[in-house]
Amino acid sequence: MNKWLDLILKIHVHPFLWIIAALGLLTGHMKALLCLLLIVLIHELGHAALAVFFSWRIKRVFLLPFGGTVEVEEHGNRPLKEEFAVIIAGPLQHIWLQFAAWMLAEVSVIHQHTFELFTFYNLSILFVNLLPIWPLDGGKLLFLLFSKQLPFQKAHRLNLKTSLCFCLLLGCWVLFVIPLQISAWVLFVFLAVSLFEEYRQRHYIHVRFLLERYYGKNRELEKLLPLTVKAEDKVYHVMAEFKRGCKHPIIIEKSGQKLSQLDENEVLHAYFADKRTNSSMEELLLPY
């Protein structure tokens, strides 16, 4: 029970949202604002509830004027199926919300105009969230797809590039189709800034992924995936090949012949504990 109470206490509202709420009250648009807030809140609680169920470490649930976000202390080492469930839990809330609104309209609890307004916001938020742009749900699902096929670092970089392409397409669509829609411009700017910040933090994000592997926190490895590397390969370049959901026995070859084999933890220990950041794999085999 305490973890659910803690979740409620972690809900934070952006100050700008309070300003929007005040303007909505003054201009008589409270019904639209309440519909929007309800949909956003339920959507984010869908993510958060599954995260709590899987014992993720939640920092806060942050509600913005045009959406929300669940900030977690997880760095890419949860099972892919588990993360998929947490991501998809948000969009799934829109299904029962729409059905509930339809039922209320059918029994005349809410007016038809209110139902149409709710439907517009519900579908708009759903479709926007499924755009393949980081940090939207669609962008996170795309990252999972890339992570299943590629090493974490390559998947993250490809996701940023793909998200940037779709973000630019979104910007062009806003510019040429709905240039007077302020909310669309706010969304575009938010996504552009989020992508820029994610790009700036890309090295730090990879290091956190590696650190979590090193300390073995919350890891449920699905399979062993050997990595064959050259003796002269640097430690950091080898770690750039680490994939999610896998533990890597590292086979070191020299002149086409197997020289030795290391566990990934030995490589991580050499990098983080021994600070052998510029060592080659062959040098790791020598006494330190």
Swiss-Prot record:
**Does the keyword section mention Cytoplasm?**
no
Which InterPro entries does the record match to this protein? Peptidase_M50 (IPR008915)
Binding site residues for Zn(2+)? H43, H47, D137
List the Gene Ontology MF annotations in alphabetical order.
metal ion binding; metallopeptidase activity
Keywords of this entry: Hydrolase, Membrane, Metal-binding, Metalloprotease, Protease, Sporulation, Transmembrane, Transmembrane helix, Zinc
Provide the family line.
Belongs to the peptidase M50B family.
Quaternary structure and interacting proteins, as annotated: Forms a complex with SpoIVFA and BofA localized in the mother-cell membrane surrounding the forespore.
Put simply, this protein is called Stage IV sporulation protein FB
The species this protein belongs to is: Bacillus subtilis (strain 168)
**Gene for this chain:** spoIVFB
